[in-house]
Regions:
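Active-site neighborhoods and metal-handling regions in enzymes and metal-associated proteins
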Residues: 1-3, 9, 26-446
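Bacterial N-terminal signal peptides
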Residues: 13-25
Length: 446
């Protein structure tokens, strides 16, 4: 039976909405990409950060799973360096002298009847399309790698082991790893830390994609606030939010949507979304879309009946105050997101605020109910690659304090997206989305 009356102002049934979400996701799957020059600049920067040697990276060979509704998604770092969204490719970079080669599988006529035409290494425009100096067949990687490796000592950077689905053509690297060809000759190093340091600083194109994801997802949150009422299911609100960001160009959710009401507002990674919202409860909505591979991460908390109780408002305002305290404490090049007693930790600022404002039913401070970190970097992954460096220009991250009291069935989290611009200013990318308790209540009025 369709839930025709579920969304106020909408006449779709739930089944229709889910269908529309999937159709919109498929329609949006033609991922936008940056200019080839942007990806090349990243490869050159990575080569400069390497201590000599060569880098070898492989794309996964298959989709995420046999029943994956959203299709293949490229591995984050491979996409960051290549802009290539299809499976079964590889990249080889030598640091000095700089050499870059992209490897593609040969055309497979039978397979392409199922998957559609693919760019092959023999295509005359392969170099132009990919933006690489040279494009070769995957079968030639073995020979190309041997041409590059120096003697008597070779360093090979890779991220083998981070990909569950490894291409058959990883053979050359595995061959070197075993030392069958050059015993005591090849030293392997992990490329992930080097790539992470690059990925944590976003360029203008990346920031724009994140803004697109954020704006589309904000529309989903606004629609949800208008639609929430006693008796509606968490799943309906989740579907509505995905519909709204899907119709604005997001190809998929950036993570499993979380819509938890009542007791489930206190469960951090609750993803069943299968309960009916009850009068007097709050609902936590942690939902964001992915635009052209780039994520956003937004959370809002709302009263199911449109009006916070006095106790809910008290907890909400403490969480809001903690976020405001962290924002005001931000210092360029000094503040950190990580937990710890360090006075430069924004987490400590938020925690101290929560722990000195309000009590639980047993008159204990509320700090113990703030059970997660304050924030994380966002980019190609919703919990993006980074290192513990202080916050600086070009970084995109969340600030998301929360209080979760199971005994009272009250969970409150407020999560916003932030970017540090080239002037060193902290910019809230979710500016305009209802954030105070009063703004949330006003947005829910019909």
């Amino acid at each position: 039976m369709g839930l025709q009356s579920g969304w106020k102002g909408y006449s779709f049934s739930l089944s229709t909405v889910v269908f529309l979400v999937l159709i919109l996701a498929m329609a949006a799957s033609a991922t936008e990409r940056q200019n080839n020059a942007d990806y090349r600049a990243r490869r050159v920067a990575l080569a400069k950060s390497m201590e000599g040697g060569a880098l070898v990276l492989f794309a996964p060979t298959e989709a995420e799973g046999p029943n994956n509704l959203f299709g293949f998604r490229q591995e984050d770092s491979f996409y960051y360096l290549t802009g290539w969204s299809e499976p079964g490719a590889a990249v080889l970079i030598n640091s000095n002298p700089y050499v870059e080669i992209f490897f593609l599988a040969e055309h497979n006529v039978t397979q392409e009847k199922w998957t559609g035409p693919k760019l092959g290494p023999e295509s005359p425009d392969a170099a132009k399309v990919t933006g690489f100096d040279k494009v070769e067949s995957l079968d030639k990687m073995h020979d190309e790698l041997l041409k590059i490796l120096p003697q008597p000592r070779a360093i090979v950077y890779s991220d083998l082991g981070s990909n569950g689905l490894t291409a058959p053509s990883t053979g050359p690297v595995e061959w070197l790893r075993r030392g069958n060809s050059f015993p005591n000759y090849v030293a392997f190093r992990d490329a992930k830390p080097l790539i992470a340091r690059l990925r944590m600083i976003k360029d203008a194109g990346e920031v724009q994609f994140i803004k697109n994801a954020t704006n589309a997802s904000m529309a989903g949150h606004v629609a949800a606030l208008k639609a929430i009422h006693t008796g509606i299911s968490e799943r309906e609100i989740s579907a509505l939010m995905q519909y709204e960001f899907g119709r604005r160009g997001c190809e998929r959710p950036a993570y499993a949507p979380i819509v938890g009401s009542g007791f489930y507002s206190t469960v951090l990674h609750y993803s069943e979304d299968d309960h009916i919202m009850k009068d007097g409860d709050v609902v936590v909505m942690d939902v964001g879309g992915e635009f052209s591979m780039y994520a956003t991460d937004i959370t809002r908390t709302a009263p199911v009946n449109g009006k916070f109780t006095a106790r809910q408002r008290e907890i909400y305002n403490i969480v809001f105050g903690a976020q405001e305290a962290a924002i005001k404490a931000f210092q360029l090049g000094k503040s950190k997101l990580e937990r710890g007693p360090d006075n430069d930790s924004l987490y400590k600022v938020a925690y101290d605020y929560i722990n000195t404002h309000g009590k639980d039913l047993h008159r204990d401070p509320l700090g113990k109910y703030f059970i997660h970190g304050l924030g994380h970097h966002v980019g190609l992954n919703v919990h993006d690659a980074n290192d513990p460096a202080p916050l600086n220009k070009g970084m995109v991250f969340t600030l998301e304090p929360g209080i979760y009291i199971p005994e009272e069935k009250i969970g409150v989290r407020i999560e916003d997206m932030f970017y540090i611009d080239q002037d060193g200013k902290l910019v809230m990318l979710t500016q305009g989305l209802p954030r105070t308790a009063e703004e949330v209540e006003a947005a829910m009025k019909h």
